[in-house]
Curated annotation (Swiss-Prot):
Positions of the Core-binding (CB) domain: 102-182
Function, as annotated: Integrase is necessary for integration of the phage into the host genome by site-specific recombination.
Family matches, as CDD domains: INT_P4_C
Keywords in alphabetical order: DNA integration, DNA recombination, DNA-binding, Hydrolase, Transferase, Viral genome integration, Virus entry into host cell
The name this protein goes by in its record: Integrase
Gene3D superfamilies named among the record's database cross-references: 1.10.150.130, Integrase, DNA-binding domain, Intergrase catalytic core
Family: Belongs to the 'phage' integrase family.
Lineage: Viruses, Duplodnaviria, Heunggongvirae, Uroviricota, Caudoviricetes
Molecular function per GO: DNA binding; hydrolase activity; transferase activity
Disulfide bonds: none
GO biological process, one term: symbiont entry into host cell
Amino acid sequence: MCPQMKLNARQVETAKPKDKTYKMADGGGLYLEVSAKGSKYWRMKYRRPSDKKEDRLAFGVWPTVTLAQARAKRDEAKKLLVQGIDPKVVQKEARAENSGAYTFEAIAREWHASNKRWSEDHRSRVLRYLELYIFPHIGSSDIRQLKTSHLLAPIKKVDASGKHDVAQRLQQRVTAIMRYAVQNDYIDSNPASDMAGALSTTKARHYPALPSSRFPEFLARLAAYRGRVMTRIAVKLSLLTFVRSSELRFARWDEFDFDKSLWRIPAKREEIKGVRYSYRGMKMKEEHIVPLSRQAMILLNQLKQISGDKELLFPGDHDATKVMSENTVNSALRAMGYDTKTEVCGHGFRTMARGALGESGLWSDDAIERQLSHSERNNVRAAYIHTSEHLDERRLMMQWWADYLDMNRNKYISLMIIQNTKKYLNKNSYWLIFKMSVK
């Protein structure tokens, strides 16, 4: 039999996640467990001296525990086994002797430190929430004694205060911490698993948006707005493409195909040092294609004259390596005389587009939802939508939206007219004739 090949540091470092958790053996029972999410855990398989049943030892998370350190822990465990001593019992006793080692806060901070892939901003925010809402209540508690009700108490307090989103995130964090405790043999089972359904159902946030009957008024105010050229272009592109704020603010020039009039927004972007959330790509974590209308291409060509020599479409005022403020579009809307809390905000452009596209009766729901990059809850339908993309229909649809806005510059064009006319004509011929009839 060929001797088992041992791991080397390079293999450990470059091990990539797969669809399912898998193991990489090092010998002597030691192996690296690589989760589907990319986390790497050192474990050792052995048989308990008392009953000869197979068990597992947890040695920690890579890279906090290196390959050499994991081997040293394995060797120590083997010495104990030779003496008929269960290394897991010794491991637990050693942890108990370490003052505070079993407190919820100690384990939570260990879990926090193990998440090496997080951005600094995200790491700080996660820890700040735990320090603010969780540690004051259960931080000093022995994690082995915590029950579901203990874990829920501080989270329910946050939920009752109306901070439902914060409470949901805290529930996720506490569940992950307790899962980490199970995986590292601090506890045998996860009481946080039973917290599901205990919090208020979070209602979808609705952003203020203008009805289509007010499009002429809005477009007139936009035409009269005399802010910075880059700001005006940002507002117009936001309206024409109805993408999310971060998707536009962090856009790079290399995402645009000018020959095909397409914008490919990546699932994730390279982070800009010192810029919060600059790593954000698509909310749904997959590439999104935005067909660009003629009007959008004109704006992009204008913008290229201003920032085309930079990486970003919308660099900061004083530092080209930074990006324009997240409040830029809403500030412009306020300067135009709108209340961004009750009348219209930048995110409300998505609602305005969704309403007009749907009311027109010209476009399939699949094409509209795909263009809005909404998640599809039905898995079978989602697979179909993802495969087909509906790109040809979406090209027509995005041009229709831009043309419809243009047509509303001087007077309101009712969507009821479109609904009453479309049944006689197909999309292409109908739209051409309709545009000619209202000139």
